[in-house]
């Protein structure tokens, strides 16, 4: 158990660090190839926060653990809304008053509904995985389109372009790219192995380990980014990161896992967890908009989200 716990902790730390290095290298190489900083920011950098979830999902699916991959995607989305947004709003109310939110919220609802419908029959096929990934590509194209037609001070642009790395020699960027990718692969295997060992020790299902340890662990970068963003007064960053990450989780994380290992999924994922994900997403929408008027997600609502997260964790472990 001690070794498995160390594997999980070391795997999480390496996973988060290697994802950052991979994005750094890829972004630097793209910049050296004279690709527009806007396109780099809206594609490579935007995908960076979901890289750990994507790699863990791929690793779990490759090992034949589709339920872990599904649990990772659903659990990350639930954690992002209930825990991350809840904790952020409790720290400081989140202002919801930008074009970014009005653009991305309808997509989040649509993509969440798509995920719910595909999971409803308790199975995922490669055709559905291909549709997820096709939707992911379309989402990236749409983000670039928005960026090209947005004013210079649009949060969508400033948020991601601010995260671009400084000019870096191509050889150094290549080293970071290769090292980041290698460590992403190794750390995801370490994390999944440790998590599965812990799950076996406590009699936990593959789905449960994905919904809890893995999902919460891979959501830590979003939690840190949102807390830092709200303290800096960058409310769009705090909320926009979560909306974008949740869209990526359904389209890319579920898509990759389904392409690698299609099959039957745990009935709880198709029922209980899909319902909670839908309910959390709709709750976030209702808290963000009241009768069409933009408003804030206040501390009381943040507390409600956190209590819902605690209640959901209790439900998982008591079932």
Swiss-Prot record:
* Bilayer topology term: Multi-pass membrane protein
GO BP terms: intracellular calcium ion homeostasis
Q: What is its main location?
A: membrane
Instruction: Tell where it localizes.
Output: Cell membrane
Query: Transmembrane residues, as ranges?
Result: 3-23, 38-58, 81-101, 105-125, 127-147, 175-195, 208-228, 250-270, 275-292, 297-317
Write out the similarity annotation: Belongs to the Ca(2+):cation antiporter (CaCA) (TC 2.A.19) family.
- Protein's UniProt name: Putative antiporter CaxA
Source organism per entry reads Alkalimonas amylolytica
């Amino acid at each position: 158990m001690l070794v498995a716990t160390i594997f999980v902790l070391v795997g999480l730390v390496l996973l988060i660090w290697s994802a950052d290095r991979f994005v750094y290298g890829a972004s630097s190489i793209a910049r050296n190839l004279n690709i527009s900083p806007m396109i780099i920011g809206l594609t490579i950098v935007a995908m960076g926060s979901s890289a750990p979830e994507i790699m863990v999902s791929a690793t779990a699916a490759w090992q034949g653990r589709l339920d872990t991959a599904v649990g990772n995607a659903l659990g990350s989305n639930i954690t992002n809304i209930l825990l991350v947004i809840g904790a952020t709003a409790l720290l400081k109310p989140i202002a919801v008053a930008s074009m970014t939110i009005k653009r991305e919220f309808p997509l989040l609802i649509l993509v969440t509904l798509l995920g719910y419908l595909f999971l409803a029959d308790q199975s995922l096929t490669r055709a559905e995985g291909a549709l997820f990934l096709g939707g992911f590509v379309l989402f990236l194209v749409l983000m670039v389109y928005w960026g090209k037609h947005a004013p210079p001070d649009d949060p969508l642009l400033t948020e991601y372009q601010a995260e671009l790395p400084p000019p870096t020699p191509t050889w150094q960027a290549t080293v970071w790219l290769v090292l980041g990718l290698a460590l992403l692969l190794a750390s995801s295997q370490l994390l999944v192995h440790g998590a599965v060992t812990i799950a076996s020790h406590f009699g936990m299902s593959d789905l449960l380990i994905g919904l809890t340890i893995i999902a919460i662990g891979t959501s830590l970068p979003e939690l840190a980014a949102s807390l830092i963003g709200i303290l800096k007064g960058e409310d769009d960053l705090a909320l926009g990161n979560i909306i974008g990450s949740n869209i990526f989780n359904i389209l890319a994380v579920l898509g990759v896992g389904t392409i690698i290992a299609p099959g039957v999924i745990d009935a709880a994922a198709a029922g209980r967890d899909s319902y909670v994900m839908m309910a959390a997403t709709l709750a976030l929408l209702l808290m963000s908009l009241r009768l069409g008027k933009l408003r804030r997600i206040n501390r009381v609502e943040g507390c409600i989200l956190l209590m819902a997260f605690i209640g959901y964790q209790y439900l998982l472990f008591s079932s």
